[in-house]
């Protein structure tokens, strides 16, 4: 009935009654899969009519009309997005820097599959992070390609996918795209502002669970003397104790924060953080929190569609880090086996937060963990670098059996107006998985790190790839069996890489690939699965061949040189005494700084 014009008018008339609108909204959420399949226009109208779109604006093309995916990321994520677009049935359109990436793998792949590239002028920041240039170039190229009459229709069937690149959490960029008529795959700017701002996230989390945040205060002021006075007053009121941590509300990756050892050091810390806020163009605002040292880093993967269906995919352990950057991730976390029920409690909190802000797309809720207590930190309003480890650890139960989890494909489906096509109970953890960020860098024990003044640091290098070769699963299992290691029922080896042999990595993010190893065990070895994962990962890393030669910053090859990666450093981490204990249960000395501490000790 709703597909006729009279029926549509009747539906819209009912929506003047709030109680009816609420019932219709809930019914559309529950029946979204059926409606999307049988009457997508009706589902679109109900969605657009029953939600307060001044707060939760439309974020999808609707009616499953997504035909062009504009990829706005590069490297391994750009390559993944192009391949997923092709598998989704959409034409890949790749944004690229003419200065740096005209021959990049993601551009070649798009053209190979009937897509096209849109060149941008300037360096990384001037191109990939420039929404004004990007929107203008999209309109220009679409007009050239589809004609002045066809361009608006083609753009209406397009969506821009930011991956985890510089546009992903950029509220000004998201708003600009909205005004330019470009659908953004992910939440709109109002949701990013409320969920991605650490201050607002802290207040929201505190309203749900007062014990789920670190003791501290949120400060909206930008006057240094006022901030110092408020911090000192809160300390006198015993709101927190020292040492503390002063953080910019919009910092990240270890930037915009400083540890404050004692009250007398507050003024210097305030001056430093406010200087970083000004230098980076961040919105003003800081938080002062009690510093909880040597914590475990955990996070929850969440997905939500525009109809209000929210799913979580368990947790990840991202404690292995260097310079506040993750280098290994694990799913599900081995240590949480010692805390029954905690995973579900934390995941339910993350789902409530996503529901509260009206999130649309993929997001991650990050938290610290120590001695059985958790502290929610922030929501990353984008797909994370480490999402493949969650995919490798989970399957989706369907009528046809267990199917792989593909978070990027689900993001595309949501952008096309589709509901999440499975229930929470259909998400099944089947494997233990570990991800290794393969970086163009290696550990140099004699170099002094200017960031902390200590000796020992990872030094990046650039190079041309000659060989990129993965071992076969059966070869690894046979090698393990020969060494007396048994019980692996299924071994997964996956390598997400932004390059092919012959490509050159220069002046780019050192992370050029992600190796994901996963194991499923037979019932007799279920308790040993994390030790089996460790042993399998070592064997895979040893057999992973990445060879090349170093290049200068201009791309000139240094003959006789060897392109260096952190592959051997990953093996050293896995062979450490701490990681041998990790598979059996919580390890007291394991925290976000342990890897660098261990390497520095030699």
PLM features: what roles do these ranges have?
Residues 12-20, 27-94, 115, 128-129, ...:
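ATP-dependent carboxylate activation and anion-phosphoryl transfer catalytic cores
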Residues 2-209, 220-229:
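ATP-binding N-terminal substructure of ATP-dependent carboxylate-amine bond-forming enzymes
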Residues 188, 206-212, 326-334:
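Bateman (tandem CBS) regulatory domains
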Residues 246:
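Conserved anion/nucleotide-ligand pocket segment
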